[in-house]
Amino acid sequence: MASTIARTEERQNAGTMELKDDTVIIVLGASGDLAKKKTFPALFGLYRNKFLPKGIKIVGYARTNMDHEEYLRRVRSYIKTPTKEIEEQLDSFCQFCTYISGQYDKDDSFINLNKHLEEIEKGQKEQNRIYYMALPPSVFTTVSDQLKRNCYPKNGVARIIVEKPFGKDLQSSRDLQKALEPNWKEEEIFRIDHYLGKEMVKNILIMRFGNEFFNATWNRHHIDNVQITFKEPFGTEGRGGYFDEFGIIRDVMQNHLLQVLTLLAMERPISFSAEDIRDEKVRVLRAMDAIEPKNVIIGQYGKSLDGSKPAYKEDETVPQDSRCPTFCAMVAYIKNERWDGVPFIMKAGKALNEQKTEIRIQFRDVTSGIFKDIPRNELVIRVQPNESVYIKMNSKLPGLSMQTVVTELDLTYRRRFSDLKIPEAYESLILDALKGDHSNFVRDDELDASWRIFTPLLHYLDDNKEIIPMEYPYGSRGPAVLDDFTASFGYKFSDAAGYQWPLTSTPNRL
């Protein structure tokens, strides 16, 4: 009787229990770009640091027809091995990697996959399976049906990791959710937004609620405006066909930047449990109106000023009449007691002057009187590269006068934590999926609320053919009107600080 109750409770908690043994990770789309750049390097990183469950097995599945040796050769090519030790660890990692080829819409293919899984699961007490869908959204529904019908474990836990995009607007997102609902419980679905796995994004809650001096000033009475900025120094460069279908708003802002906004704006959760955190994020989204077109500017990059870099429309995969925005700046408002009237300025663009993702919180002006035009305080969180936090503050310039100077309290992670490795976002998120921790994954109602905010704007831009994005040069800061746009919502730029971020060579970790 007791064992029956225990098994029942375990089934009820299947979505949140940690998978320690008898686990197989199946990478669907194993020959694709995402698996190559992110999934396999992340799995190897977890293996190197001994975070994968004991006896883990990794199965690749894709349409590409290749034998076991060719598959292992590809896996090896995905992972950098700068030392002999890492090369030996990769050899060991490859010993539990296997591959099966098949179609995404054929029962026979998935029956064959299930036979392979059952073969490598022989002797296990349970069949715990994580299906990582590194696939284009066009096959999500078909593959979901096939997995449930032919590959769902008889005795064990099943989880499915789904990559963005989760639709193109509110209706398509709901259609996708309805397609997944018959096959998968919400607790079995892990919707990845890899920005939620980034170290500095995960640090937002600790900074906010673990430091009283931040918590006390985190409101409309002290904060004038918030900027969340995403900049890439490269264009589409041959991948314009995919990007043109979605654009910068769907690709970056509706998901990555909005997720950061919810963490910045949410109230203190009851606990750090996944549901309590996500409940508070949803409350923020429900307090936001749809983005108004008057609070938006869009741009599309042209040639660089020296002519060395091509314009967006010079990409052979991009239609010549494309109106797809490669840059956007917009302002959102949250209608609640804490944030009413505070503009949240989100900016994102390709082919800009630098690689940077940062959060810039600008506080209100110092009460006038003894100071004249003294610069505002700012809290800046650098998400990437060079993960850092610094506070711009006013201080007395050493000497006999009472002259003020802007200085900074600077926490640069690579200096302060030089002996610690900052994990890649995908490593962190795959580990969370193994643990059954949904905190850093997107819930269904959260997804629905986010699309409600963006869909009217997206339809407005899609339907009004006369709206043409402003051209900006490849390698610039964006459209020429950008500074006036941010200033119109209260942002005050001051060069009194003369602050220059330390430039160091860092890998692109997007």
From Swiss-Prot:
Residues binding NADP(+) 2: K347, K356, R360, R382, Y390, I391, K392, D410, L411, T412, R477
Active-site residues, as the UniProt record annotates them: H256
Pfam short name (any one): G6PD_N
Record keywords, A-Z: Carbohydrate metabolism, Glucose metabolism, NADP, Oxidoreductase
Protein EC: 1.1.1.49
Gene Ontology terms, MF aspect: glucose-6-phosphate dehydrogenase activity; NADP binding
GO biological process: glucose metabolic process; pentose-phosphate shunt, oxidative branch
Cellular-component GO terms for this entry: cytosol
Sequence positions that bind D-glucose 6-phosphate: K164, H194, Y195, L196, G197, K198, E232, D251, K350, Q384
Pathway the protein contributes to: Carbohydrate degradation; pentose phosphate pathway; D-ribulose 5-phosphate from D-glucose 6-phosphate (oxidative stage): step 1/3
Gene3D superfamilies in alphabetical order: Dihydrodipicolinate Reductase, domain 2, NAD(P)-binding Rossmann-like Domain
Reactions mediated catalytically: D-glucose 6-phosphate + NADP(+) = 6-phospho-D-glucono-1,5-lactone + NADPH + H(+)
UniProt-annotated binding residues for NADP(+) 1: G29, A30, S31, G32, D33, L34, A35, K36, R63, K164
Sequence similarity: Belongs to the glucose-6-phosphate dehydrogenase family.
Function per UniProt: Catalyzes the rate-limiting step of the oxidative pentose-phosphate pathway, which represents a route for the dissimilation of carbohydrates besides glycolysis. The main function of this enzyme is to provide reducing power (NADPH) and pentose phosphates for fatty acid and nucleic acid synthesis.
Protein name: Glucose-6-phosphate 1-dehydrogenase
Annotated organism of origin: Aspergillus niger
Gene: gsdA
